[in-house]
Curated annotation (Swiss-Prot):
Gene3D superfamilies per the UniProt record, alphabetical: 2.40.40.20
Primary role: Catalyzes the pyruvoyl-dependent decarboxylation of aspartate to produce beta-alanine.
Modified residues (Pyruvic acid (Ser)): S25
Protein name: Aspartate 1-decarboxylase
Family, per entry: Belongs to the PanD family.
Organism, as annotated: Hyphomonas neptunium (strain ATCC 15444)
Cofactor(s) of this protein: pyruvate
EC number(s) given by UniProt: 4.1.1.11
Keywords for the protein's UniProt record, in alphabetical order: Autocatalytic cleavage, Cytoplasm, Decarboxylase, Lyase, Pantothenate biosynthesis, Pyruvate, Schiff base, Zymogen
Post-translational modification: Is synthesized initially as an inactive proenzyme, which is activated by self-cleavage at a specific serine bond to produce a beta-subunit with a hydroxyl group at its C-terminus and an alpha-subunit with a pyruvoyl group at its N-terminus.
Record-linked InterPro entries: Asp_de-COase-like_dom_sf (IPR009010), Asp_decarbox (IPR003190)
Active-site annotation: S25 (schiff-base intermediate with substrate), Y58 (proton donor)
Tree of life domain: Bacteria
Length: 118
């Protein structure tokens, strides 16, 4: 049996832009993608801590060092610049290995600076 387990999350991210007319996705600074292990075009969940909205989309690269978290397309109706969010990706893990699985957790601070990664 394969279990769906947390692969990685960006915790405490701040939305820096919303673009309703973009084709969709969430744009994430390449440094943050690298730190979390989330890949471009990978399916992610975004949970809006500010208002409770929860959506599923895919990640795109934003310029390295920009600290961008940009919610695009229809999802932009559920997010606003300044909202605090959690972005999570999941993976399939064989049940026998699930207890040994350890996700990557990246805690973000002001300006989407990395405070801690584990």
């Amino acid at each position: 049996m394969i279990l769906s387990m947390l692969k990685a999350k960006l915790h405490g991210a701040t939305v820096t832009q919303c673009d309703l007319h973009y084709e969709g996705s969430v744009s994430i600074d390449q440094d943050l993608l690298d730190a979390s292990g989330i890949l471009p075009h990978e399916k992610v969940d975004i949970w809006n801590v500010t208002n409770g909205a929860r959506i599923q989309t895919y990640a795109l690269e934003a310029p390295r060092g920009s600290r961008t978290i940009g919610v695009n397309g229809a999802a932009a109706r559920h997010f606003a610049v300044g909202d605090t969010v959690i972005i999570a990706a999941f993976c399939g893990v064989e049940a026998e290995k699930a207890r040994q699985h350890a996700p990557t957790v990246v805690l973000l601070g002001e300006g989407n600076e990395i405070k801690r990664a584990s």
